[in-house]
Regions:
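Polytopic alpha-helical membrane proteins, predominantly small-molecule transporters/carriers
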Residues: 2-288
């Protein structure tokens, strides 16, 4: 048996009969809902419940690893397991981003660069292992594990990118630069800690436009559908981070972490029900 699976089709079509949900508009609505929930739930666990960024990251990453193992071991697609794993990746990516940028003191510019390098490495490992442009080829156990590692890394990168776009200064939550592991090193060598400071509203709108641009490229050009898929995944995470902050912070809706998280759980559940009915109707149409 060959170690690296191969496939004849460079499309996403084969995923519908394997372990990934059908890639359509409802899929992306669920992804955006999940990533936005990840931002508010991550802040709720680390800040409101006072787990801290390190403690929250440890708990959430442990849950993510367990969910990933179950997802990989399941022989067939289970939508609830897929979305549970994706949501845990989104929440864990939020707390991991805050731990890297704030607790370690890397700040937004250097933190985003560090996580981007990790994202390129995991995506390259996934592509090398599958030896294909077909996302379906990643569904052996190692390839699927690399897929989920890339999802987690893209969530972490997206969160720090969203924070860097929207925030002007790095909030150290009462710490000083000297309290962090790398803060003094970063500032001493001329790296900034803060972000661009567009604000949550402007960042959310800009990222929505960028996501729409990815959709247009996907539908209207011959660019690889898998490249567009990963581009969409990466864009949805900073969009979720900016939208989540817009819902919770003073310059947005000011709902707070708890109420925003509760609201987004309801939204995610509603979108999931709509997606289930849509996919069921789609399957019934194909069966006729």
């Amino acid at each position: 048996m060959s170690m690296n699976p191969s496939t004849n089709s460079p499309t996403l079509a084969s995923n519908t009969s394997k372990k990934l949900p059908h890639i359509n508009g409802m899929y992306w609505a669920l992804v955006v809902s999940s990533t936005t929930l990840g931002e508010t739930a991550g802040d709720f666990i680390s800040q409101t419940l006072d787990f801290g960024y390190g403690g929250a990251s440890a708990v959430l990453l442990a849950l993510f690893v367990i969910a990933t193992i179950l997802q990989v071991l399941f022989a067939k697609q289970h939508a609830w397991m897929y979305w549970t794993t994706l949501t845990l990746a989104s929440i864990g990516g939020t707390t991991l981003c805050d731990w890297i940028t704030r607790s370690l003191g890397l700040g937004y510019p250097l933190g985003s660069l560090t996580i981007f390098i990790s994202l390129v490495a995991t995506l390259s490992a996934w592509k090398w292992w599958t030896r294909s442009r077909d996302l379906g080829a990643a569904l052996d156990k190692i390839g699927e594990s690399l897929y989920w590692l890339t999802i987690l890394t893209s969530s972490t990168f997206g969160t720090v990118l969203g924070d860097m776009l929207s925030k002007n200064e790095l909030d150290l939550d009462g710490q000083t630069i000297g309290d962090t592991l790398f803060g003094e090193f970063v500032t001493r060598h001329g790296f900034g800690l803060g972000g661009i400071g567009f604000g949550d509203t402007a960042s959310t709108v800009a990222l929505l436009v960028l996501l729409a641009a990815v959709a247009v490229v996907t539908l209207k050009t011959r660019v690889s559908r898998v490249s567009c898929y990963w581009g969409g995944i990466i864009v949805t995470h900073p969009l979720g981070a900016a939208a989540g902050d817009f819902m919770t912070k003073d310059d947005g809706l000011h709902l707070g972490n708890a109420w925003a998280t509760l609201l987004l759980v309801v939204v995610l559940a509603a979108v999931a029900v709509l997606a289930y009915r849509n996919n069921k109707s789609h399957a019934a149409t194909l069966a006729e």
